[in-house]
Structures are given as C-alpha cells and as structure tokens.
C-alpha cells in the first residue's frame, strides 16, 4: 500500500509515496 501522502482524485487514487 501507499505510505505517505495519498491523493484521491475524482476517479483515480495516486500514491505519491508508494512503498510495496
């Protein structure tokens, strides 16, 4: 999962700090 900042736009989820 993403550790850090997680931005949730209208449809997609973008993890700025994605650490498996």
From Swiss-Prot:
Predominant location: secreted
EC identifiers of the protein: 3.4.23.-
Entry keywords, A to Z: Aspartyl protease, Glycoprotein, Hydrolase, Protease, Secreted
Organ and tissue specificity: Expressed in chorionic epithelium (trophectoderm).
A cellular-component GO term for this protein: extracellular region
Post-translational modification: N-glycosylated.
Signal peptide: none
Domain of life: Eukaryota
Class of the enzyme per the UniProt entry, highest EC level: hydrolase
Biological processes per GO annotation: proteolysis
A GO MF term: aspartic-type endopeptidase activity
The keyword Signal belongs to this UniProt entry's keyword annotation: no
Keyword Metal-binding: no
Subcellular location: Secreted, Extracellular space
Family: Belongs to the peptidase A1 family.
Descriptive protein name: Pregnancy-associated glycoprotein 73B
């Amino acid at each position: 999962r993403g550790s850090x900042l997680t931005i949730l736009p209208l449809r997609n989820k973008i993890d700025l700090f994605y650490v498996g």
